[in-house]
């Protein structure tokens, strides 16, 4: 019984050390996409009202749903990128490339908001979304070579961007 307690305590100790070691990485990993999202929202806040005036395609969710979904996605994206960064020694080339693709996807994500809302340019925003989806897929491909669960956390992001593409096309066609 005593040896079992020592083994459990040792395991808890090692687990706590691992958490302490990687916690800052995960906090930063989550903070990065959330900051990008907050910045994009702040820069497009005055233009968001346009969404309510547009003709939208079937299945268009209410505007209140977007910040909720994006917040969840940003947290998943941050956990995913932090997981790859923390395990980069497993496959340095794929980790590096995947994180670069992820950075490009964050930039495109930010640009889409500006193009669609601030510039009211649905077609250029759609082109931006196509590139965004490409970089998300590339990110997933590289992440899976490092930590598969990190790649899986990017799948909801890709799915939402496909849905955003559908909405973007619908808005573009219905509001010409």
Residues of each region from the PLM?
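N-terminal membrane topogenic signal
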Residues: 16-29
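Alpha-helical transmembrane segments of multi-pass membrane proteins
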Residues: 33-49
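Membrane-interface helix termini and inter-helical loops of multi-pass transporters
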Residues: 45-59, 90, 175
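Short aromatic-rich membrane-water interface segments that cap or initiate transmembrane helices
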Residues: 56-69
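Helix-adjacent hinge/juxtasegments
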Residues: 75, 79-113
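Membrane-interface helix caps and helix-loop-helix hairpins in membrane proteins
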Residues: 111-123, 172-176
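Membrane-helix boundary connector in multi-pass membrane proteins
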Residues: 115-121, 137-152
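Terminal transmembrane helical module of multi-pass membrane proteins
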Residues: 144-176
């Amino acid at each position: 019984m005593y040896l079992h307690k020592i083994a459990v305590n040792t395991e808890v100790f090692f687990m706590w050390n691992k958490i302490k070691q990687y916690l800052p990485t995960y906090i930063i990993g989550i903070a990065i996409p959330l900051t990008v999202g907050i910045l994009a929202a702040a820069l497009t806040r005055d233009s968001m009202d346009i969404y309510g005036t547009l003709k939208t395609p079937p299945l268009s969710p209410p505007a209140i749903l977007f910040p909720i979904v994006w917040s969840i996605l940003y947290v998943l994206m941050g956990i995913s990128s932090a997981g790859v960064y923390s395990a980069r020694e497993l496959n340095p080339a794929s980790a590096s490339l995947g994180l670069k693709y992820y950075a490009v996807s964050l930039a495109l994500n930010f640009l889409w908001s500006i193009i669609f809302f601030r510039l009211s340019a649905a077609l250029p925003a759609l082109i931006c979304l196509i590139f965004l989806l490409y970089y998300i897929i590339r990110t997933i491909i590289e992440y899976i070579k490092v930590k598969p669960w990190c790649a899986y956390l990017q799948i909801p992001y890709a799915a939402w961007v496909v849905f955003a593409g559908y909405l973007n096309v619908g808005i573009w066609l219905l509001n010409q």
